[in-house]
Amino acid sequence: MDISLFDYDLPEELIAKYPVNPRHSAKLMVLDRKSSNITHSTFWHIDEFLEEGDLLIFNDTKVLPARLLGKKKGIENSNVEILLLRHLENEKWEALVGGKNIKPGLVIEISYDFEAIVESQIEKSKFLVLLKAKNQNQIEAINKYGKIPIPPYLGRDEEPIDKEFYQTVFAKKEFSVAAPTASLHFSNELLEKLKKKVNIDFVTLHVSYGTFKPVTVQNIEEHKVDEEYIEVSESLIKNIKKTKKMCKRVIAVGTTVTRALETAIDKPYFGFTDLYIKPGFKFKVLDGFITNFHLPKSSLLILVSAFCNEENLDGREFILKSYKEAVKHKYRFYSYGDGMLIL
């Protein structure tokens, strides 16, 4: 399939530049794959579309302030920006490094007690870097000096509001460089409300550059997704099997949860996944899916289209129709935007 088939027009003013408060006041579009019906609601009322005993699965990863600003050691006016993409092992990270003449061996001074050493080049502006922190571990140093890597399409720098709202309320395991945005809509109050009706569980997927890497090929079959680390526990697998046995629904909150579950399927899994979901993919775990409104021609929009494919429903056409409906009703798009529940 040609990537142009996943394009759509979006007015600039519908790109959400800031989060809504409270989180659960975001709009919710509900799509029914069987009837092709579209219903408008809010996240606070999402329980009205769920059944007693359904299982909602979230991603408990935590966003690191992965944007580090520094300068070449010993050289004035030599600003360098590092965006940590993926933790590899110990002090070693995969990172985008922006600046002039970035070469292996370069030492980047982030602070008097925190440095990055460029070890080798992977491709273009992507490098392997070693983080060296004095009198603290590297995560403490990243949290101390780093900035939240808010998406570039917000067109602004990080602000205090982002520290709270570009993080889920249940974030626990650090190492993501972007938020699992479908979960940003869930406040503590909404979670307490939901627990009275449905079951809640968690996977871990540490979001890396692979999740939001642009599709640069014309034929979507040729796109490759970078590896990301996931954890799917034995207790979650048991919970999923129990839910299925009761004829209730397993609902993934976000594309990261979707990819983790469809990688593990019916066994515990601790490792990496490069699963790329596109039209024709056969879902083995999911019965429902909560997600945001994604960028045109993105792998995430391709994934959502794949989930909407039914025997008598073209998933791509249905999703693009729903996006047109969202524009008409002034839904807010992308990371800080509104969301949809697909059943």
Curated annotation (Swiss-Prot):
Superkingdom assignment: Bacteria
Enzyme class of the recorded protein, top EC level: transferase
Biological processes annotated in GO: queuosine biosynthetic process; tRNA wobble guanine modification
GO molecular function terms noted in the UniProt entry: S-adenosylmethionine:tRNA ribosyltransferase-isomerase activity
This protein's GO CC annotations: cytoplasm
Pfam families tied to this protein: Queuosine_synth
Main location per the UniProt record: cytoplasm
Keyword hit for Zinc: no
Catalytic activity from the UniProt record: 7-aminomethyl-7-carbaguanosine(34) in tRNA + S-adenosyl-L-methionine = epoxyqueuosine(34) in tRNA + adenine + L-methionine + 2 H(+)
Compartment(s) of residence: Cytoplasm
Stored Gene3D superfamilies: QueA-like (3.40.1780.10)
Subunit relationships: Monomer.
Main function: Transfers and isomerizes the ribose moiety from AdoMet to the 7-aminomethyl group of 7-deazaguanine (preQ1-tRNA) to give epoxyqueuosine (oQ-tRNA).
Entry's family note: Belongs to the QueA family.
PANTHER family given in the database record: S-ADENOSYLMETHIONINE:TRNA RIBOSYLTRANSFERASE-ISOMERASE
Name by which UniProt lists this protein: S-adenosylmethionine:tRNA ribosyltransferase-isomerase
Native species: Hydrogenobaculum sp. (strain Y04AAS1)
Name of the gene encoding the protein in the UniProt record: queA
